[in-house]
Curated annotation (Swiss-Prot):
Protein's organism: Shewanella denitrificans (strain OS217 / ATCC BAA-1090 / DSM 15013)
Ranges where the record places region Domain II: 65-143
Record family assignment: Belongs to the RuvA family.
Originating gene: ruvA
Main localization (coarse): cytoplasm
Annotated keywords: Cytoplasm, DNA damage, DNA recombination, DNA repair, DNA-binding
GO CC annotation terms, alphabetical: cytoplasm; Holliday junction helicase complex; Holliday junction resolvase complex
Name of protein: Holliday junction branch migration complex subunit RuvA
Keyword Phosphoprotein on entry: no
One term of GO molecular function: four-way junction helicase activity
Amino acid sequence: MIGRLNGILVEKHAPEIVLDVGGVGYELQVPMTSFYELPELEQSATLYTHFVVREDAQLLYGFITKQERALFRLLIKTNGVGPKLALTILSGMTAGEFVSCVERDDIVTLVKLPGVGKKTAERLVVEMRDKLKSLLEASVGNEREFMLQTNYTAPAANAEEDAISALVSLGYKPPQASRAVSKAYKEGMDTETLIKLALKSML
């Protein structure tokens, strides 16, 4: 089991990255909340990982914090939620926003995420409530702050096509992704900010 990787960030194509660790390039899928916190290319990065083995693939998921990985692991234990959907959920909202949705029984916001139907949203609220309470109780200081954070800031990068591609990778239909990006785009806007605003507009 690979629990953590530290290496040089050599590729960034949301939601995938490649981390060079001792000459070996590890391809990881990361939620957008972690993607926004990554350094520039050729800089050192540390990611906490979750390894998934399927019949047709071996996939590595990466997270900037242990708490986001813990939330991802709780999500995939929910009936009907696989790694791809968990990644989409953590890309569409911060950990704090998700916690807030569960606490408020906010099914309406959850079903706006691609792949989350009414039944899945209801299961998430019911099954995650006690699990999240335990996770929050076990978190202290910065860990607890992260779990309750309801916004994030995105650093600089590139543009519209990349943003649309990232949204499609997360499960949104191309026309929907294109409309959201066009609506959010302003001249000079970087890719991460554009993705963030487009995601917000669809919730």
